[in-house]
């Protein structure tokens, strides 16, 4: 009789668990990553099966789009990265000769020249592949507004690249 009661209890528990609404079992975060955009809004420059992946680390580009950079090799191959960290790795460690570097403007989501961008370095928003966040803006006024709200320092590309190199070699 004890075995029957035990089996009946186990069966009832399994039946109860199996009928539970699974959507309430695992609450979903109401906040997406700051870096993320819908795939339909991401400008992807690479061709082929892995066009949505960073060429260095493989991370999903729409997920980390607001920190994405693009470049071309001397032979004209277009490459896209999830972060400046991966650009530095490709350029400095892999010795890939990169030209025509661009970065995503955090506000418009368009690609702009890294040399015309204003980077906010070290804001409270999360970085990609680094503890020190780096977000780019087409207009200095937009970078200043972002830095005022989320902290960080407004820098040009060369200074931001130097910070990223130091982060990479820690």
Which residues are covered by each model-predicted region?
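C-terminal motif of bacterial Sec signal peptides marking the signal peptidase cleavage site
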Residues: 15-18
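Bacterial signal peptide processing site
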Residues: 20-22
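Mid-length scaffold segments of soluble, non-membrane domains
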Residues: 72-111
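C-terminal partner/receptor-binding element of secreted or periplasmic proteins
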Residues: 138-170
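Cys/His-rich metal-chelating microdomains
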Residues: 60-61, 89
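Residues immediately within or flanking Cys/His clusters that coordinate Zn2+
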Residues: 51
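Bacterial N-terminal signal peptides that target proteins for export
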Residues: 1-8
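Short cysteine-rich clusters marking metal-coordination/redox-active sites
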Residues: 54-57
